[in-house]
Amino acid sequence: MGFNLTLAKLPNNELHGQESHNSGNRSDGPGKNTTLHNEFDTIVLPVLYLIIFVASILLNGLAVWIFFHIRNKTSFIFYLKNIVVADLIMTLTFPFRIVHDAGFGPWYFKFILCRYTSVLFYANMYTSIVFLGLISIDRYLKVVKPFGDSRMYSITFTKVLSVCVWVIMAVLSLPNIILTNGQPTEDNIHDCSKLKSPLGVKWHTAVTYVNSCLFVAVLVILIGCYIAISRYIHKSSRQFISQSSRKRKHNQSIRVVVAVFFTCFLPYHLCRIPFTFSHLDRLLDESAQKILYYCKEITLFLSACNVCLDPIIYFFMCRSFSRRLFKKSNIRTRSESIRSLQSVRRSEVRIYYDYTDV
């Protein structure tokens, strides 16, 4: 689902063909570039993905355990739980890429990546993006429109909307799996598009445009909600000082969402523009293609890092999550420490009066 940046790596046969073609003009340049390219693919990327795989398993495993003990009392918590599920599924695709890039799997192992792993990776990445947009809308409604249509605030509406998101993403993804039905050979295995049927190639292109539109829509929603909440808080803080502090926390929360979104997803989608909306990558020379390839893989890695940054959203935005985390780790927040100290002092005073009465 989406452009197979994890798999279609500036097709190796084309890249090596260009290098061998130019080998008569440059004695050591192409070989050096090929070595650097191979080291980046077989060492750097597998190590990076292994790091975020381990980190994501630990962080999201902890998040699953904590959310398991939190009731679905608000739509916000339910959206967060959906993001945890999407992140975990996305994380489980990393080992397949690590094995393939490190060269441990057989040559036909890439067929599994093209047909299944890549589809799951992108499907869950865009599922997370959609739920980040829904969280921003939820924060906007809670702050700016707290007395709006009650149906939009109900947990039932949230569950129905979440199911619709998963169904739509599944409908977009399944044809990419079914229509990747070509017979893998050593000649076509380097390009996932060659493993698709003609209809599969068209469907893949259509889904790529849909995903790009989804990203742009969520980007506009995030920016719009952040600006609207900031302006509303700025106006209300002059009139209702007591309520402004609570609403300012909502503004800080959505600021975390915007920061994670811009850090993880914006660079990748800016880098994929030449691949999505034109054939600019085919018009570039060899060195420019390599630069674009490195940028593409680095920004894709940033997108994958979202599975490690989402737990930050849970901690800063979900009070129930942070309280449960502190409770299980025997760490007290500042407010809890103050309340505990006040309780101890009251009990000491009570004991003193009981003693003096005797």
Swiss-Prot record:
Molecular function in Gene Ontology: G protein-coupled purinergic nucleotide receptor activity
Bilayer disposition of the protein: Multi-pass membrane protein
Gene Ontology terms describing biological process: G protein-coupled receptor signaling pathway
Glycosylation sites: N4, N25, N33
Organs and tissues of expression: Expressed in placenta and prostate. Weaker expression in thymus. Not expressed in thalamus, hippocampus, pons or cerebellum. Overexpressed in squamous cell carcinoma of the lung.
Regions crossing the membrane: 48-68, 76-96, 117-137, 160-180, 209-229, 257-277, 298-318
Keywords, in A-Z order: Cell membrane, Disulfide bond, G-protein coupled receptor, Glycoprotein, Membrane, Receptor, Transducer, Transmembrane, Transmembrane helix
A Pfam family: 7tm_1
Coiled coil: none
Disulfide bonds: C114-C192
Subcellular localization: Cell membrane
Domain of life: Eukaryota
Induction notes from the record: By expression of p53/TP53 and by DNA damage in a TP53-dependent manner.
InterPro entries according to UniProt: GPCR_Rhodpsn, GPCR_Rhodpsn_7TM, P2Y13_rcpt
Extracellular topology ranges: 1-47, 97-116, 181-208, 278-297
Main function: Receptor for lysophosphatidic acid (LPA). Necessary for p53/TP53-dependent survival in response to DNA damage. Promotes the Hippo-YAP signaling pathway and thereby modulates glycolysis and oxidative stress production by the regulation of hexokinase-2/HK2.
Similarity remark: Belongs to the G-protein coupled receptor 1 family.
Protein name: G-protein coupled receptor 87
Organism: Homo sapiens (Human)
